[in-house]
UniProtKB/Swiss-Prot annotation:
It comes from the Archaea. It comes from Methanosarcina mazei (strain ATCC BAA-159 / DSM 3647 / Goe1 / Go1 / JCM 11833 / OCM 88) (Methanosarcina frisia). One of its GO terms (biological process) is phospholipid biosynthetic process. This is Putative archaetidylserine decarboxylase proenzyme. GO terms for molecular function: phosphatidylserine decarboxylase activity. Belongs to the phosphatidylserine decarboxylase family. PSD-A subfamily.
C-alpha cells in the first residue's frame, strides 16, 4: 500500500523517468539519456519503498500508549518522547491513543536536520488529542529534506488508537507527550514501530 499524499511525487518521478526512457529509445540509446532514465528508475523505486504504508494489526487498549511513528527514540524529557524517522522508515504517523482531536496547530519554520536541537524552529504540525487521561500532543516536525507535512485528520475527528493521522515526507521527527497517568516504558536509542511498540503503560495505582 502506498501512503496517501505521496501520489504527486511518485507520478512526477515515474513520468520523468518514462519520458527519458522514450527519448533514449528514440535516439538509439544515447548514453546521457540512457543514464538519466536509469537514475530515474532507481529513484522511483526508492520512492516506492519510502512511501510504503503497510497494513498493521493494531492491538488497542486503554492501559497503554503506542508509538506514533517508526524510528529511533532520540530523546526523552519533560514527559515527551522524541522519535527520529530515518529515510528507510515508514513515514506514516498513527494516533498513540484513542480520543478526539481538539486542535491542530500548524507552524511554518525552517528545515534544519530533525535531530538537532535547533529543529524546534522547523516547520511543524501539532495534533492535540483529547483522551480520557487528558490531552496528548503529537507533533510532526519536518526535517532537512522534508518540505511538506501531510495531515489525514481534522479538528473534531474521533481517532482510534493506531489510526493513521498524517505523514511527513522524507527525513523527519515526531514528538509525543505522555500523560502523568502513564509510565514511560521505552529508552533513548530504542527502535519503535508505529501502531505496534508500547511506549507507555498505565500506572498500577490508576483507577479505571
Amino acid at each position: 500500500m502506498i501512503a496517501k499524499g505521496s501520489e504527486p511525487w511518485l507520478f512526477t518521478a515515474a513520468s520523468v523517468t518514462a519520458l527519458f526512457a522514450i527519448l533514449s529509445r528514440a535516439t538509439d540509446g544515447l548514453p546521457f539519456l540512457n543514464y538519466i532514465a536509469n537514475v530515474g528508475m532507481a529513484l522511483t523505486f526508492v520512492m516506492v519503498i519510502f512511501f510504503r504504508d503497510p497494513e498493521r494489526k493494531v492491538e488497542t487498549s486503554d492501559t497503554y500508549m503506542i508509538s506514533p511513528a517508526d524510528g529511533t527514540v532520540i530523546d526523552i524529557r519533560d514527559r515527551k518522547i522524541c522519535i527520529f524517522m530515518f529515510l528507510q522508515n515508514v513515514h506514516v504517523n498513527r494516533a498513540p491513543i484513542s480520543g478526539k482531536i481538539s486542535e491542530i496547530i500548524y507552524k511554518k519554520g525552517g528545515y534544519l536536520p530533525a535531530f538537532c536541537k535547533d529543529s524546534e524552529r522547523n516547520e511543524r504540525n501539532e495534533f492535540i488529542i483529547h483522551s480520557k487521561y487528558g490531552d496528548v500532543r503529537v507533533t510532526q516536525i519536518a526535517g532537512i529534506i522534508a518540505r511538506r507535512i501531510v495531515t489525514y485528520s481534522n479538528v473534531n475527528d474521533t481517532v482510534e488508537q493506531g489510526q493513521r493521522i498524517g505523514m511527513i515526507r522524507f527525513g523527519s521527527r515526531v514528538d509525543v507527550t505522555i500523560p502523568h497517568d502513564f509510565d514511560i516504558t521505552v529508552e533513548k536509542g530504542e527502535r519503535v514501530l508505529a501502531g505496534k511498540t508500547i511506549i507507555a503503560t498505565i500506572k498500577n495505582d490508576r483507577d479505571f
